[in-house]
């Protein structure tokens, strides 16, 4: 089955209505997903990406019904993850000498997944292009850490279609392919869920990459993603939304999540929520039990919130395991400009609350006062919990509501972003490293995201003191922006 996208572009992907888990079991899919592959037939025939490996044979059968596989002139792999390149091994068995265009980093990951170093790889970088005939070119734009080091986007001139890889996508399955055909509230929900759970750690890179693409002043008539719908009507609305999400996004919202052995901490959570509402009824307050509710929905609400409260019973003087796991995920997602507080019940001592407070502080949250209740909360303790909620509401009140993000419940037609207008040739550009560094500063720059390590500043968040030379930086060091190791750094040349 194929779906006509535009002119000589067809969707040849695979819908997956039944899938529930992604990245192991870390991401729960509530609406299925699609693995989007695109066939372009100009004077040259090009296949962009494949599908998940579980659908390899079905994908090839469908493709053979559409074209002679031998007519494929080359394959573009925007990303090597198995849900993008999974059918590549089966396809290459039938057309083994077909060139594969990808980034240099993708060769390593493709070979690592498929174990075929003899394949005909062609390395591309930002600004490289291929003439596919009829006056059209494919132009490549590297997008490292969105969300893998090997990621790139591909732009088709003439048709003005951006094959955006994982960016602007969503795990959302529908028989209809285009954004203007589906339920807009459902689409927004899945886009936000996808961004908040997968792309949040790379928000600074999202902004930089979007600004780089906008600087090319290319027309964008469609954005063809790797998962979910194709953005056909006002495609730049999702670009605008990504820029908003990447800019320390927060609504007038507070999220409370907890785990409880005997419902004591649940009682506290309910009373705290009531106290917040007493003081500021306009604040959206959501309460979640991490043992019973969707973890990814909780994380999406954390992303939307100006502050969170995390509660746990104390077990063996530590927090409940599911709360510990959630805090580990929150630390990895690197939320910015948010407040937090801990609460919980205990019998012998309240170690869980202290540990939660410490973890939230380490994760970069601005932490407020904690609250502990011994045994099952009685009337006095419940009043204290409600008063605590009232105090939190006052402490976290935003005087100027205009500084908060406006919740968007559905996509709507909007004015396209300025800057995506006339088509011009692409030239290679890279994000500019910190201009404050001199050429003789003995700095090191990350080749993936351009973050600069300066010995004069150190990296206090990883315990690296001011004055530490690169040779003395420990091997466990990770780039604060892209979280890759020392091996991706090179000497800064100014």
From Swiss-Prot:
Binding site for Fe cation 1: 79, 81, 147, 166
Entries under PROSITE patterns matching the protein: FLAVODOXIN_LIKE, RUBREDOXIN_LIKE
Domain of life according to the entry: Bacteria
Subcellular location: Cytoplasm
Essential cofactor(s): Fe cation; FMN
Cited PANTHER family: ANAEROBIC NITRIC OXIDE REDUCTASE FLAVORUBREDOXIN (PTHR43717:SF1)
Protein known as: Anaerobic nitric oxide reductase flavorubredoxin
Organism: Vibrio vulnificus (strain YJ016)
């Amino acid at each position: 089955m194929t779906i006509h996208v535009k002119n000589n572009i067809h969707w040849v992907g695979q819908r997956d209505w039944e899938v529930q888990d992604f990245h192991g079991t870390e991401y729960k899919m509530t609406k299925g997903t699609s693995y989007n592959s695109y066939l372009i037939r100009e004077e040259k025939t090009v296949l962009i990406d494949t599908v998940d490996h579980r659908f390899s044979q079905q994908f090839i059968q469908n493709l053979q019904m559409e074209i002679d596989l031998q007519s494929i002139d080359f394959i573009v792999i925007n990303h090597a993850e198995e849900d993008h390149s999974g059918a590549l091994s089966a396809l290459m068995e039938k057309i083994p000498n077909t060139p594969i265009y990808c980034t240099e980093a993708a060769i390593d990951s493709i070979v690592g997944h498929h174990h075929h170093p003899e394949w005909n790889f062609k390395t591309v970088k930002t600004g490289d292009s291929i003439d596919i005939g009829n006056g059209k070119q494919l132009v490549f734009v590297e997008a490292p850490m969105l969300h893998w080091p090997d990621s790139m986007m591909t732009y088709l001139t003439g048709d003005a279609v951006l094959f955006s890889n994982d960016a602007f996508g969503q795990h959302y399955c529908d028989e209809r392919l285009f954004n203007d055909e589906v339920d807009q509230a459902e689409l927004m929900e899945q886009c936000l869920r996808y961004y908040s759970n997968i792309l949040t750690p790379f928000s600074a890179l999202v902004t930089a990459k979007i600004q780089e693409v906008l600087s090319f002043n290319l027309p964008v008539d469609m954005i063809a993603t790797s998962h979910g719908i194709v953005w056909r009507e006002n495609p730049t609305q999702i670009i605008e939304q990504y820029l908003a999400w990447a800019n320390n996004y927060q609504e007038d919202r507070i999220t409370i999540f907890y785990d409880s052995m005997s419902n004591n901490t649940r009682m506290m959570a309910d009373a705290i929520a009531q106290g917040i509402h007493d003081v500021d009824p306009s604040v959206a307050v959501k309460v979640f039990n991490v043992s019973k509710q969707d973890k990814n929905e909780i994380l999406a609400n954390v992303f939307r919130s100006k502050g969170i409260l995390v509660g746990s019973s104390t077990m063996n003087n530590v927090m409940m395991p599911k709360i510990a796991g959630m805090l580990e995920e929150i630390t990895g997602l690197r939320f910015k400009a948010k407040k937090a507080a801990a609460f919980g019940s205990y019998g012998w001592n309240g170690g869980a609350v202290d540990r939660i407070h410490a973890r939230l502080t380490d994760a970069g949250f601005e932490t407020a006062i904690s609250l502990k209740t011994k045994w099952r909360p009685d009337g006095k303790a419940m009043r204290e919990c409600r008063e605590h909620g009232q105090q939190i509401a006052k402490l976290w009140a935003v005087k100027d509501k205009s500084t908060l993000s406006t919740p968007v419940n559905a996509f709507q037609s909007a004015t396209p972003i300025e800057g995506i207008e006339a088509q011009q040739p692409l030239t290679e550009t890279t994000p500019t490293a910190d201009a404050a560094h001199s050429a003789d500063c003995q700095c090191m720059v990350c080749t993936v995201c351009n973050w600069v390590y300066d010995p004069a500043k150190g990296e206090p968040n990883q315990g690296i003191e001011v004055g530490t030379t690169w040779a003395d930086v420990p091997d466990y060091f990770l780039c604060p922006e892209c979280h890759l190791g020392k091996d991706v750094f090179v000497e800064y040349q100014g």
